[in-house]
């Protein structure tokens, strides 16, 4: 009997030592994370998935070919240095992005800085997977001709790493089946017809390496007056 009690006590002590609460996990992440160092593994690029979920189209200027858009930018990647044993601990935590390495993604045809509208927190899972999905307002330069027609206009937005070539960061569109207008405001003066995403690999005159980007094509048109009253 005493032996069984002793074994149970030892097991409880081991589990207590192995278990981590959220404060422990956050402390460990802050201690091990290196925000300035890209987390490549064995010379393989960091695989980054990105997609845009459009929330609203606020303004379209057909004279200057500019569009003002609000969207969620869903970005995922893996950083194995952040992983922990979740057997007796939470399997995910929210972490300020200032404590993490974050891909230096930029929209190549943006004409304003991204205005982040939500708390700058990322979800980190126990296997090291990171999801960052801020709500962003930003202006882009793109062809908006035809926005008043039935077929609408198609604005193309290119997003890729600003400094890392394809041997350091591999960028791919998120593969998922969802309604393109699922999150889009019903009160917008515009409506989404279609959204497509594709991957590009481009070599620029400045550099010998290829750079990857995700090209998001937003097909939209202005609603009829009767539809927005």
Swiss-Prot record:
The keyword Magnesium appears for this protein? no
What's in the keyword line of the UniProt record?
Answer: Disulfide bond, Glycoprotein, Immunoglobulin domain, Receptor, Secreted, Signal, Synapse
Q: What InterPro entries does this protein map onto?
A: Ig-like_dom, Neur_chan_lig-bd, Neur_chan_lig-bd_sf, Neur_channel
Principal place of residence:
other
Q: In which tissues does this protein get expressed?
A: Expressed by glial cells.
Where is carbohydrate linked to this protein?
Answer: 85
Mind telling me which GO cellular component terms the entry cites? membrane; synapse; synaptic cleft
Query: Which ranges carry the Ig-like domain?
Result: 114-217
Q: Give a short account of its post-translational modification.
A: N-glycosylated.
Q: Name one Pfam family in it.
A: Neur_chan_LBD
Entry coiled-coil feature ranges: none
Which CDD domains does the protein's record reference?
A: LGIC_AChBP
Superkingdom is Eukaryota
How does the annotation summarize its subunit structure? Homopentamer.
Q: What is this protein called?
A: Acetylcholine-binding protein
The species is Lymnaea stagnalis (Great pond snail)
